[in-house]
């Protein structure tokens, strides 16, 4: 039998008791040592230096490795390391789609992202990490018990551990031109002396977005109302975010640190929409409007802080995190129809969060046992006032979540087994205008089990897993306020939304550079957006966007990934089929269609001589009809060309997104006595330049993982 030691030098081999054994220890650069086994072995290795004239080592690291909870993609030494920033690299991971801070793991949903065990709170942080600093990326499709019950998937990025003392820095500039320009600047400095790290980071971004929408709404009531709308949306903002902190490692067994992260808008953010609507009643035109909607968002300072301790006490590992988060926003909305100011609204939000998490682990029965607790305390207050098109709202939510969890993992020959359980107690207090509403103040007690097993041998692997997931609605949905979208479109929250629960079963297998997975999910109280008429007696022809829950939904899917290497060319093919069996009869929608959706992407990487790298990728998503939702075929092609200089400390890249200008999104939606057609284009076609420079590259050793991430996302 044989094994490789862990980072602390400990190792584990399975053997029968009562028999004599010899242990052989080998380490590169030292002479091999052989000695009889005894319970507390100590090995003294002598240097073994040999002068070699020339050695050439050729090997290919597999891009994908399968584990019991998902898969691991090796980044260092592969084409993934040449994708620019971590944000640009993520969509090139197997079964990961999305961009601009919005990512999706096929068959799972939006992931929680970690960098070196530290949760990513601000997605712009992914722009600041270069892909060539990342050692590996784990895509966890069955999160363990230590993760919150609403975590659908996890992506963990592990950076390359670099040595060095003194001052180090990293600077990055990005510019892209589409319908309007976007730009950002990033600076990071780290000073290391002995076991102390002092670091400061700053990020400045100017964002301009542009979109065009063609829309048709039809409402059936006492009459048939149809509204056709064409509008253009723009959003302009400038933001600054920073990070200041320290990390201290007095020895190899203990470390602690603190970081403070402020963020604010520079001036006001502007969100505008303008266009025309034509409304008909029983095919006779009743209204023609030229409209303009302007919203100003006034942002003060948001504050976040994290403190952590990570240490070893004998065989026990301890990881503790405490978090604080404070956010507030204020927006004014004004709508003008045919030169008349018809709508004025004011929204104010203030929220705070306190969270703590403790994880303790130790070896047990030739495996690993971990347990811990997590607590989050959230306070959010929303005040909405308007000039008569709906009703004012004053919603105040206080929520406390207490969780305890335990997890055990064990390796038996070629098998890896993992089992865990998590208990969560959630108490919500909902107030309207200072009065507690008991019907909207539920208490939940949930047990979340996790089971996973995997087998691997000689390049082949197979895994099975099960997890229960529980989701609470975003706080923005738990409100009674009516939001104005246009004269004939309103939106509303729903404070009566129940908790959504998902039972997910998955299986996967791999061989060499082929990977296949399948999943089945049973979803209870699934959140869904619906459309319906809004108060036909007082607001005829107005469409209301709302959120409801569907009692039972089934979701099926299969995925295939192929990632061979053919000389300079490294292609990666992803094929995914998703089928949603959804019946919305119980919420009043009779439309039910069942047609799967296929997603196909081809990612082509060319590792060229002299530091050149070229990537071109394209995807196609087919039309589908699932439940009351109908989509059309869509796709895009994007490319990247980069060159490294000065021993890879300087990198310059040219990027092109949506080259053929095909990034349109078409969908039709059936509702309660209502129907909608949409054609949407966002400013996806962009051409850009990126310049990145680093010196004396060292990484901060900050090990804080953060707590209460699920509540941060909801806020």
PLM feature spans:
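N-terminal periplasmic accessory domains that precede
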Residues: 40-46, 86-89, 123-124, 138-139, ...
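Surface-exposed extracellular loop regions of Gram-negative outer-membrane beta-barrel proteins
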Residues: 328, 381, 425-432, 455-504, ...
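Short, acidic Ser/Thr/Gly-rich low-complexity loop/linker segments typical of extracellular
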Residues: 1-10
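Outer-membrane beta-barrel signature, preferentially recognizing the C-terminal barrel domain
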Residues: 296, 396-399, 439-442, 470-524, ...
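Short acidic/polar hinge/loop motifs at secondary-structure boundaries
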Residues: 14, 92, 118-144
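Short, acidic, small-residue-rich periplasmic hinge/interaction motif at the N-terminus
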Residues: 24-30, 40-79, 99-100, 108, ...
